[in-house]
């Protein structure tokens, strides 16, 4: 039985980052995962999906703007299988990188299913062989989350999919019904529609991207409809029936009930924390209503020596948030200076077309919180770089408090907006105002100029509108 200072269960972006930081701080560290290093994100989530989305961007450009760009072809061939193969190469490269980082930081890697048998002991059952116990002064749980199920609908990996088989399949569906208008549903809708699939997006709430600012949701629905995607909001999934060649989906909405048909259905309705069969209840670890592990600001559970980070805590199910939690957790274990994470100000990014990015309060949330809200906007149509890219739909919306100029949030839709967030989030964290952003000289021409421009708008001296 090996003994460690820190033992991490789960090797995704939260877990492996926590393991690295703990090792940097002088701890003897091990990490456990039942599937693979890098977790869902690197293997079947964030990373391969971004590779597919880049292929989709090129395909979309060739299909919709080829003539504008001066490309002439009589028979454009789009090979989806090649796109998937490229996404696997990107994923494999990064997973090998994580493996290297484990070796570099002298972190022991144990592959198998973990269970806590005591507050300082973890049993690891490999796919072959007997379970092995490991002792640890500190145990960090970073087991992630799994797709929510729909009552009466059983995914089979062929006709009814979740994200995992969907991202691995090399055959492009001729038609697909995507249930769920959040990030995963939106990104798959972009990929498949760009390659020519007939896509229907079904969302139970009254708008897609329901966690975003309402204006962003409306703009995105308009753009996706223009791209040939059928968007059905306020529509509930009732029943799924499979035949040999297609899937029939019964839905209900404002217009009553209807039956949709497609080759495949993708279920993308959210996630539940992976806390089952970990032995948490026996140790008295407190769980929340959704099964999430309850933690304090230090990432500590109610049981001394047991910590939790990432999606399993359901704080904010985003890979970068999990990584930040991992660093803070490792630093708290080591007793060194660290920070307190403000989950309300975390960056959020969706890589559909057009891209969506945001942080902080929406306009409605800011008003509800009692701020004297000032809304400033700048359109990409007035940005030279966006025009040069022939991708200028969308805008940036900045939310500030008119009394002090405090930055409360920002909401963006348009080209590469996911890359524009850090300037605003660090400004908010450093308590800068729109005045400082407006006076920060930005390279020209660049998409980042929209941030300077919207700050000028907020300050009452708009330049290019």
Give each language-model segment a name.
Residues 10-15, 144, 180-185, 270, ...:
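Conserved phosphate-binding and hydrolysis motifs of nucleotide-dependent enzymes
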Residues 9-11, 17, 23-35, 40, ...:
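Flexible, glycine-rich terminal cap/loop adjacent to redox cofactors
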Residues 7-9, 114, 134-144, 178-179, ...:
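Short hydrophobic core segments
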Residues 1-12, 172-182:
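Beta1/beta-strand and adjacent pyrophosphate-binding region of the FAD-binding site
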